[in-house]
Every structure is written in C-alpha cells, then in structure tokens.
Design a protein with these regions (language model features):
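Metal-dependent phosphoester-hydrolase catalytic domains
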Residues: 5-31, 131, 145, 223-233, ...
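Sec-exported extracytoplasmic/periplasmic mature domains
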Residues: 65, 69, 97, 126, ...
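Soluble or luminal CAZymes and related metallo-dependent hydrolases
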Residues: 52-59, 84, 88, 134-139, ...
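N-terminal, active-site-proximal structural segment of metallo-dependent hydrolase catalytic domains
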Residues: 2-95, 110-115, 159-160, 164, ...
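Active-site beta-strand/loop signature of hydrolases that rely on acidic residues for catalysis
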Residues: 39-46, 63-87, 121, 172-173, ...
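A solvent-exposed, charged loop/short amphipathic helix patch at secondary-structure junctions
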Residues: 195-212
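Structured beta-strand-rich core segments of catalytic domains in phosphoester-bond hydrolases
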Residues: 53, 72, 76-192, 295-298
C-alpha cells in the first residue's frame, strides 16, 4: 500500500512539473550593457479594441499611447467600424500615429460595416508586408520586415518607406537595406477554441477541431520562419499552451521564448477567464537575438494581458 501511494504521489509530482514548468520561466532578466542595441516589442490581444469607445475614452488606446514604451506594437483582434459613432480606422491611426509613424493594418474580416484582424504600429519603417491567410476568416498571421536605422542613413529609408503605399522599399533599395538592421516580424492570431457553455463532450470536440486547425496554421508560420533571410521576432496569440504541438511546431529548438528566458519563477498567464488562467500569448525570437527582459502587464482592458519584451540585436 505504501509503495502504491509513493508511485501515485510521484506520478502526481511529475504531472504537476510537466504542466506548470513550461508556464513558469527559468531565466533571469538582464540589463543591457552600454552600447547594446535593443528593440522593445509589445504583443496584445485587444479583444475587439474597445470598439464602442472613441479614442479619448478608450482604455486600450490610452494604454498604448501613454502606458508603455514599446518600439513595436503588435495587436490582435482589432475591430474598427465604418460608422463614426464607434471606433473607426481613422480614429485609431490618428490616436497613435504621432508616437508610431509606421503601421501595418492586416484585416481578415473586411466588409461594409467593420474590419477585424491584426495591426502593427512601429517607430521604425515596415516593409515587405505579407498576409498568411487561413481557411477560418477570423484568424490570420501578418509578416513584415522592420528596418531599424543605423546612424547616418535613417532619414533616407524613413522617407522611402513613408512614401510607398505598397510593400515599402523595392529590390533596387537593397544596398540601402544593408545599412540597417532588418528584423522579420510575424504577428499571429491562431484558431480559437470557441468555448462556451457546452457540455464536456462538445467542448472536447471543439478543442479537437480547433487544435487540428492551429497545427496546420503553425506549420504555415514555421514555413515562413524557415524561409526568412533575417532574424525573426514571432509574436501573438497562439491560443495554445507551451506543451502543445502548436507551440513547438513554431518554436522548435531555434527560437527563444522571451518569457522563459528572462522571468525566473514567475507564472506567465496571459489569458484570464474566471478561475482559468493560461499562457497562450508569446514573444519568440531567433537565437541571433537575445531576450533581456519580458513582463506581463496585468491591466484589465481585455481578456488577455499585454506581453512586453526587450530584445538585444
């Protein structure tokens, strides 16, 4: 009997470690040394962006405008309306364009009433923008290259990127691009489980269908990672846990998880729903880059928390 209790207790501990260790970080934050070049990245599932509130009364917008110091903001589940009674695309641009002159709006739903999808705001030029589309319309991955100016050439590239309404710099500008640090950015919103008040069997079925869709989407993201000529930062709402095949299809062994690398011993829940808490939002980067710090801002403006990382390049 004692032996059986010992085995059960040991198995319980192993399962607990397997479940909670990937949710808790193992590394410690570090302060960049003098001369280290860093980029500050924020990812945030905004849960429809407080779309019924205009900018001055919109908590999400006020947080982005005043509550953090990111160089690049990656937003998922952004919803804007054509009706000026609600939050419009023009409202969003005006509210953040002074702080972030470069942007990428990539909407998976686009009709005569509303737009819904991913948005990137940046202090640096964004070029080579491309959408990775999936069969489910509400989910999308958005790829672009962030061109971080070096001393002496910033004005040239900034002017070219601002003036191009399409993909940004052209192939003829490759000599200019080499004078900059270019990082490929992929921001993601992968398949949701769509859990509601269903019974257990229906929840299992929903999870199974959503998980299969996420794995296929993760393979598409992984293909984009493998084909990148630049170091990458991959962010967003994967809608799956760190133990999942979705996460590992994307991360594999050649990407660093900023939270795991820098936030020793902290529980990394980014989604809170009642008593349920899970880490499903991520900032990953290539091994050529180095996460120095990663924090979760526990602000109550969405059902997700924003995730903020400082990355050396």
């Amino acid at each position: 009997m004692r032996r059986l209790k010992f085995i059960i207790y040991t198995l319980f501990l192993l399962v607990a470690v397997a479940v909670f260790l990937p949710l808790c970080s193992h590394g410690t934050p570090s302060t960049p040394q003098e001369g280290t070049r860093v980029v500050r990245v924020l990812t945030y599932n905004t849960h429809r962006m407080g779309m019924f509130r205009k900018p001055n009364d919109n908590q999400v917008i006020n947080y982005l405008r005043n509550g953090q110091d990111a160089d690049i903001i990656c937003l998922q589940e952004v919803e804007v309306y054509k009706d000026s009674k609600y939050l419009t695309l023009s409202d969003l641009k005006r509210a953040l364009s002074t702080k972030y002159p470069y942007s990428y709006f990539d909407f998976s739903v686009y009709n005569n009433r509303r737009q819904f999808g991913n948005v990137v705001f940046s202090r640096f030029p964004l070029i080579h923008k491309q959408t990775i589309r999936y069969p489910s319309r509400a989910n999308i991955s958005s790829r672009c290259d962030v061109v971080i100016p070096s001393d002496g050439a910033a004005r040239v590239v900034a002017k070219k990127a601002q003036g191009d309404a399409g993909s940004g710099l052209q192939s003829s500008d490759s000599e200019e691009i080499r004078r900059f640090d270019t990082i490929r950015l992929i921001t993601n919103h992968l398949e949701s489980n769509r859990f509601g008040e269903d019974d257990f069997e229906e929840l299992k079925q929903k999870y199974s269908v959503a998980h299969e869709a996420r794995v296929e989407q993760a393979k598409c993201v992984r293909e984009a990672i493998d084909n990148s000529p630049y170091p990458l930062i991959v962010v967003g709402d994967f809608n799956d846990l760190p133990l999942s095949s979705t996460y590992w299809h994307i991360r594999r062994l050649d990407m660093r998880d900023a939270f795991l690398c820098t936030s020793w011993g902290r529980y990394g829940a980014t989604l809170i729903k009642g008593i349920f808490a899970a880490r499903i939002d991520y900032i990953l980067c290539s091994r050529a880059l180095r996460p120095l710090r990663c924090t979760i801002d526990r602000v109550p403006y969405s059902d997700h928390y924003p995730l903020h990382a400082v990355i050396a390049y």
